[in-house]
C-alpha cells in the first residue's frame, strides 16, 4: 500500500498559460498525484512530429497496435512464461511529454492490465528506490492513442542527495 502523501501545487504551474512549457519534477509529481494528468502534454514541436508519425504509421500498419506488436513489442508466448505475473516490456517513450532535463519518461507495456502493486514491483526491480523516485499513471481511455495494449506512463528521476 502506498504511503499517504501530501502534495501542494507548485506556484509556477498555477501561473502558466503557454502550451510550450517544460514541466518540472514538482509539476509532474503534483499533476500525477492529484489526478490531473490531462494537463501534462508534449512540447508543440514534439506533438507535430508525433501527429505526422501517427498518420504515417496508421497508413502503413492500419493500427498503432499492429505497428507496436510487429516492430517493438515482442512478448513471449504463454508457453514460454512460468510466472503468474504477466510479462512486460519497458521502453522509453519515443514521443515524451515536455519534462525538464533529468526526468525520464518510460512506458511499461503489457498484454493485460497491470495492478499498481505489480507496477511498483516492476519499477523497483529496474530502478533502485534509494537512487530513483517516480510517479506513474495510465491515461484515461478518452486520451489513449493505444487503447488495446495496456501501458503505464512512468516519470523517473534520480534522487537528489
Q: What are the residue ranges of the model-derived segments?
A:
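HIT superfamily nucleotide-processing domains
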Residues: 1-161
Amino acid at each position: 500500500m502506498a504511503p499517504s502523501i501530501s502534495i501542494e501545487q507548485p506556484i509556477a504551474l498555477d501561473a502558466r498559460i503557454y502550451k510550450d512549457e517544460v514541466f518540472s519534477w514538482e509539476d509532474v509529481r503534483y499533476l500525477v498525484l492529484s489526478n490531473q494528468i490531462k494537463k501534462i502534454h508534449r512540447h508543440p514541436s514534439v506533438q507535430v512530429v508525433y501527429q505526422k508519425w501517427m498518420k504515417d504509421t496508421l497508413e502503413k500498419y492500419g493500427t498503432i497496435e499492429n505497428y507496436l506488436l510487429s516492430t517493438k513489442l515482442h512478448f513471449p508466448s504463454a508457453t514460454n512464461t512460468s510466472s503468474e505475473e504477466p510479462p512486460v516490456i519497458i521502453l522509453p517513450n519515443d514521443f515524451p511529454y515536455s519534462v525538464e532535463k533529468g526526468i525520464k519518461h518510460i512506458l511499461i507495456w503489457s498484454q493485460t492490465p497491470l495492478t499498481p502493486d505489480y507496477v511498483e514491483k516492476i519499477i523497483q526491480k529496474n530502478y533502485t528506490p534509494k537512487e530513483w523516485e517516480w510517479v506513474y499513471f495510465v491515461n484515461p481511455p478518452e486520451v489513449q492513442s493505444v487503447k488495446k495494449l495496456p501501458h503505464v506512463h512512468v516519470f523517473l528521476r534520480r534522487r537528489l542527495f
